[in-house]
Design a protein with these regions (language model features):
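Transmembrane beta-barrel domains of outer membrane proteins
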Residues: 111, 140-144, 236, 310-313, ...
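Terminal intrinsically disordered/low-complexity segments used for targeting and assembly
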Residues: 2-4, 12-88, 243-290, 332, ...
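Periplasmic alpha-helical coiled-coil/stalk elements that build and connect Gram-negative outer-membrane
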Residues: 151, 160, 167-284, 395, ...
């Protein structure tokens, strides 16, 4: 078996000494332990505190709404189509998707930096005595040995950044769907209000005609004729408001769809109120931690801060690298006898921080403080999420009570109008009484329409508060 030359044994021994020295110095560095990547436990109620049976039924309905597609529960094909189009073309979602791609690419770059690197290099060299000048060219290899703590911190940071980007995408998706639904409901309510005001304008014209006839027979004064005409003008002027609201809602829908020339549903030609659907939720307060994009983002911010603290701690450890080079030396000038010779070198290298005036310790303290900030904000986000969901339930309860009252008033007004019509046909009521009863019924229908819109918006707010439009489980 061939024996190693003495200088080779000495070189090998020197390498071992260097490596052992680096590891020994690493053990001497005092660093506070990095916090564990775990979110704090936040106490939340085990059930919702909705006082009325209406709100309670919204939580315990037999057929709960699927939060990933809650808008379908309204059974409105036009709304379903608008939501689908917005999810496919909205600029906000395009921006979020691009950010997710960027974060994924950065994560791949971070993972790639942990592996060996090969480079084609060329640089001038000079002999130790300064007499010969060479140009050295070849392939350089370098591998920064990833110590376990640094490797785990870098991978954890990349994963947390990706999850934060996905949470932002989920939040944008939920906001977009909520805005599309809310705007669509407002548009339809304004269009139905227009139809009701058209009927009220026709009644005002009839009332003005009847008043003029009565004035001609000296049964009413001229002031009453003027008042009836003024009421008609006011009703027609009032119709401009829902017309403008409908036009504005259509413009907002076009923006949400990402196309100002987008084809939108035809205007409603009927004053019929929207169909009320019995919607329910089975989510409990603890479910918000898994569903709300804001809670998910806060959770990943805690993980990110924990891994950043671990990386700051790893910065105080030695950095060990394996280096290698193979190439050629070209003689540029000098008395050397050989103008071309091969070069090969390989071995370890390390860098160990010894003194930096307290910079590393201050950096670690800062990262620990940022971790404390992230955990505090996580607790706040969880409590705020539960509070917003509870407030949305209470608001829905209120709007459902108002809607029930409005429907009852509308029913009474319609029955009174029908009764007055029958009395007028029998000669027991005059035309003014009939038009006034019908006007009161139309006004009650307008009030009911506004209550229906408020109830629909309350449902939208409730689904949004529960993390509605969350990404399906199969999505990346």
């Amino acid at each position: 078996m061939p024996q190693r030359a003495p200088h080779c044994r000495r070189a090998t021994g020197s390498i071992y000494v260097l490596c052992l020295s680096a590891l020994a110095l690493a053990g001497c560095v005092a660093s506070p332990p990095a916090p564990s990547a775990a979110v704090p436990v936040v106490a939340v109620p085990t059930a919702w505190a909705a006082p009325a049976a209406a709100a309670a039924s919204a939580v315990t309905a037999a057929a709960p709404v699927d939060l990933t597609s809650w808008w379908r529960s309204f059974e409105d094909p036009e709304l379903d189509a608008l939501v689908a189009r917005s999810l496919g073309a909205a600029p906000d979602l395009e921006a979020c998707a691009a950010r997710v791609r960027a974060v994924r690419a950065m994560a791949q770059a971070s993972n790639a930096s942990l592996g060996p690197q090969l480079s084609l290099v060329g640089l001038p060299q000079q002999s130790p005595d300064g007499r010969d000048n060479y140009f050295q060219s070849g392939i350089a290899a370098q591998w920064n040995v990833p110590l376990s703590q640094r490797q785990a911190a870098l991978k954890g940071l990349a994963e947390a950044e990706l999850q934060i980007a996905l949470a932002d995408e989920q939040a944008a998706r939920a906001t977009l769907v909520a805005e599309v639904a809310r705007t669509y409901f407002e548009m339809r309510a304004a269009e139905r209000d227009q139809q009701l005001l058209k009927q009220m304008a026709a009644l005002s014209d009839e009332r003005a005609r009847i008043t003029r006839v009565l004035w001609q027979t000296r049964q009413v004064s001229a002031a009453e004729v003027e008042s009836a005409a003024a009421i008609g003008v006011q009703v027609r002027a009032a119709a401009a408001q829902p017309a403008a609201e409908a036009a504005q809602a259509r413009l907002r829908l076009a923006v949400l769809l990402g196309d100002l020339q987008a084809a939108l549903p035809a205007p409603a030609d009927s004053a019929a109120p929207p169909v009320r659907v019995a919607l329910g939720l089975s989510a409990l307060p603890a479910d918000l931690v898994r569903q709300r994009a804001g809670v998910r983002r806060a959770e990943q911010s805690v993980f990110k801060a924990a891994h950043a603290t671990g990386l700051a701690r790893a910065d105080a450890q030695p950095q060990i690298s394996l280096l290698g080079f193979v190439g050629l030396n070209f003689l540029v000038s000098g008395p050397a006898s050989s103008s071309l010779r091969g070069v090969f070198s390989a071995g370890p290298a390390f860098s160990m921080p010894l003194f930096d005036g307290g910079q590393r310790e201050a950096n670690q303290s800062a990262r620990h403080a940022e971790f404390d900030v992230a955990t505090a904000l996580y607790r706040k986000e969880v409590m705020q999420a539960v509070a917003e969901a509870q407030a949305a339930l209470l608001q829905l309860d209120l709007e459902r009570q108002r809607m029930a009252a409005a429907v009852a008033v509308e029913g009474t007004a319609l029955r009174l109008a029908d009764s007055t019509d029958a009395q007028a046909r029998a000669g027991l009521a005059d035309g003014l009484q009939r038009t006034e009863a019908r006007r009161a019924a139309l006004q009650a229908s307008r009030d009911s329409l506004r209550s229906a819109l408020a109830e629909q918006v309350a449902y939208v707010d409730l689904f949004t508060a529960f993390g509605g439009a969350a990404l399906p489980a199969a999505a990346p």
